[in-house]
Amino acid sequence: MNSLLVDSGFWYAFHSPRDQYHEKAIEYGVYLENACIIFPYPTLYEILNTAFVKSKTSLGRMEELVNAPNTRCINDSKYLTSAMKLTFEKGNNKSLVDNIIRLMLDDDTLRIDGLITFNARDFYDVCAIRNIELISD
């Protein structure tokens, strides 16, 4: 079973028919069928915002997914200090969540086979170094 880390943008698109990437997210959904899905906690903080939780259908589907036996939620505390430093570093235009994801992708103690994102430019380098499949538009 492949381990896939999935970025917040994918989940927004997957659950929102009006999102510009919705059709692509549905297409990428096949990757999730037989995968171990990795949820960094920061992506859950982004996804489960006020607007999202108002949709009981989307919230219910996300709850099932998060609680599924093939899902792993990853605590970010190990990465937070370094990610904060990177975020405030001059010339780094990546969000705190993206920096945490980058550090997780770079962590060889985590088995990550692929990353699903619609923001490939922020992750392509670390994915290439670690030989992680980048599933992106």
Residue ranges and their predicted role:
Residues 1-21:
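Metal-dependent nucleic-acid phosphoesterase active-site entry motif
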Residues 10, 43, 79, 100-101, ...:
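Alpha-helix capping/helix-boundary segments
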Residues 15, 51, 127:
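Short, flexible helix/strand-to-coil boundary loops that buttress conserved ligand/catalytic motifs
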Residues 46-47, 82, 104, 125:
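Phosphate- and divalent-cation-binding pockets in alpha/beta enzyme and binding domains
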Residues 52-76:
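Helix-adjacent hinge/juxtasegments
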Residues 72-118:
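Active-site neighborhoods of divalent-metal-dependent phosphate/nucleic-acid chemistry enzymes
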